[in-house]
């Protein structure tokens, strides 16, 4: 059995009407836990930290959409694991950066890497998220991509640059 806690602004009456038991509020949850895996939308995690985590002594791991400043360490489980030990707040790299660093870090440990050039061709939106409106076009972001900058933050000895191309699809990524 799992307990369900509601975030601020959730309609508790709707849960009650559907006979879904609610254990409490998000603040009440924060009083009960030692660590929070915060995957809320970008910007909400830092608000949760200020409003709840610091108040109740809750350690937190934030998803890639948050600003790096939310955490003690910008964290990747392979490339800088040791830096995250005994820290209160970690911010994870984005999904693309996570995969990229896994590859670069493994190659770096085996043969040494000084420079990387990255190309990411990715969907413009997640499945079910169609609000971006890109149709029959490719959109290229300015170099270097945040993935290249993030890689250099985690692995400062590697010089990285990269381009990112958004495609008008909702499935799939190509990282080279």
What are the language-model segments listed below?
Residues 104-176:
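Active-site-lining helix/loop region of Rossmann-like oxidoreductase modules
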Residues 1-125:
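N-terminal Rossmann-like NAD(P) cofactor-binding subdomain of oxidoreductases
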């Amino acid at each position: 059995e799992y307990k369900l806690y509601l975030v601020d602004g959730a309609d508790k009456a709707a849960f009650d009407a559907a006979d879904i038991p609610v254990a409490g509020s998000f603040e009440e949850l924060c009083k009960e836990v030692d660590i929070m895996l915060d995957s809320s939308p970008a910007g909400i995690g830092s608000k949760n930290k200020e409003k709840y985590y610091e108040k109740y002594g809750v350690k937190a791991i934030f998803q890639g959409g948050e600003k790096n400043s939310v955490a003690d360490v910008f964290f990747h489980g392979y490339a800088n694991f040791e830096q995250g030990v005994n820290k209160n707040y970690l911010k994870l790299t984005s999904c693309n950066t996570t995969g990229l660093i896994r590859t670069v870090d493994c190659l770096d440990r085996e043969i040494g890497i000084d420079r990387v050039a990255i190309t990411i061709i990715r969907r413009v939106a997640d499945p079910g998220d169609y609000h971006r409106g890109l149709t029959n076009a490719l959109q290229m972001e300015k170099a270097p991509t945040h993935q290249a900058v993030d890689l250099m933050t985690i692995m400062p000895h590697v010089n990285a640059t990269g381009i990112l191309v958004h495609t008008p699809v909702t499935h799939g990524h190509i990282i080279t």
